[in-house]
Structure formats: structure tokens, C-alpha cells
């Protein structure tokens, strides 16, 4: 399901959110170093690290941020979001955009292929190493890949016309920092899209949107078979 969230006319900026119903990695089953998925009328080849469970088991310690390797999987939300970006391709062309938590890079690459000027950001440097490779595998011009913590924005205030993220929140404590980032980075009249699988944390996020005078609506819904 895709939500469109825009501010109250007397408030600040606009945004959109995407929501769908699956929550299983598209690579469920025997692990392969390359995935091929079809989105936006073409195939995409995506290289990734070991499967999430193997990476998880190899981790020897957790920090306060519990940096679990979600980035190495391709989640159904990313395909829903990719299709939504394709529907918005005329609006995206030539615009400064940011993929919030880009992982191995699918939606950043889709938007770059569609003509947007994309920043792909992730908290994990290893994710961006694979995202960069995936641009090469798919003959897409490299987005600007950057390691960034959404709690510490490294972009100019109100500089981005569109911001999106695919299933980026796993705990309620993520909701406020994500919304803070959107309020900081999104340009006047801009929009943000969040694809999500109806996880409870997004109820918290939507409540925060309302409390901060952001209006939202579902604009796209799609079932994805893992």
C-alpha cells in the first residue's frame, strides 16, 4: 500500500508513503550472491553479501544501535517502491532526490535510471560498496553514494525535492528521527514516500505525521510474492 502524505497548507513540506503486505526477503530459500528481479519493465541484477542470517551469526558484538545486516536482503517493499517511482518518473526527472537507507541500491538505481539526481545513503559502508557494484552491473550512472546517519544529516537544509525509503523502520524509536530528517532535508513543496509492510511501528510514524501537521493518504498498494 502506498501512502501520500502532504503537509497542511499552513505547515511545512510534503511527503508520500508506500505500504504493502509482505515482510519476507525476496531471496528466501537457498542463498545466491546475485539476485535478478523485474521492476519498471526491465530486469535488475543485484549483487549482495552473505544472507542476513549468516552475517548476523558472524557478528561478535552489538552496539547501542544494534546494526543488524538488514541491508543485504532485498525486501518486497523495495519492489513496490520501485514501481511507484516509475509511475512518478516525469516528476523525478532532473530533481534532487535521496534514497533513505538504500541498502544494495535498487530504488536509488531505478530513480537514477529514470533521470533523477539521486543520493543513495545508508548507515552501513558495506551496503554502499554493493550498491556501487550494482550500478555497474545494471549500466546505470552512479548515484552519489554516502554513509550517513539520519540523526546527523549531511545534506543542506530543505535541499531535496523527493525523499523515499523502503521498509526503513523496525522499532518505534526510529520514527521520530526519520521524521526529523524529512523535516530538515525536504524542500518546500517536496514529497516523501515510505514503502512499508504494515508493521506496527509505522502506526507510530503516521501518528507523528498527524501530530506535526502532516496529512497522509495511501496512494499505491501492491502484493508481492516472495
Predicted segments with their positions:
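S-adenosylmethionine-dependent methyltransferases
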Residues: 2-226
Amino acid at each position: 500500500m502506498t501512502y501520500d502524505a502532504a503537509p497542511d497548507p499552513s505547515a511545512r513540506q510534503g511527503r508520500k508513503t508506500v505500504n504493502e503486505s509482505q515482510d519476507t526477503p525476496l531471496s528466501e530459500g537457498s542463498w545466491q550472491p546475485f539476485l535478478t528481479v523485474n521492476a519498471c519493465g526491465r530486469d535488475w541484477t543485484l549483487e549482495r553479501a552473505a544472507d542476513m542470517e549468516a552475517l548476523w551469526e558472524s557478528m561478535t558484538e552489538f552496539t547501542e544501535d544494534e546494526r543488524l545486516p538488514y541491508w543485504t536482503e532485498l525486501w518486497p517493499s523495495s519492489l513496490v517502491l520501485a514501481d511507484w517511482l516509475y509511475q512518478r518518473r516525469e516528476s523525478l526527472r532532473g530533481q534532487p532526490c535521496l534514497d533513505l537507507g538504500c541498502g544494495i541500491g535498487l530504488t536509488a538505481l531505478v530513480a537514477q535510471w529514470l533521470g533523477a539526481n539521486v543520493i543513495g545513503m545508508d548507515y552501513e559502508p558495506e551496503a554502499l560498496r554493493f550498491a556501487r557494484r550494482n550500478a555497474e552491473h545494471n549500466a546505470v550512472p552512479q548515484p552519489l553514494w554516502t554513509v550517513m546517519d539520519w540523526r546527523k544529516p549531511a545534506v543542506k537544509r530543505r535541499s531535496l525535492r523527493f525523499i523515499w525509503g523502503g521498509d526503513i523502520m523496525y522499532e518505534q524509536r526510529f520514527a521520530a528521527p526519520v521524521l526529523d530528517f524529512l523535516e530538515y532535508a525536504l524542500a518546500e513543496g517536496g514529497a516523501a514516500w515510505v514503502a512499508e509492510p504494515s508493521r506496527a511501528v509505522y502506526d507510530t510514524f503516521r501518528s507523528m505525521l498527524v501530530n506535526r501537521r502532516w496529512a497522509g493518504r495511501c496512494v499505491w498498494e501492491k502484493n508481492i510474492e516472495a
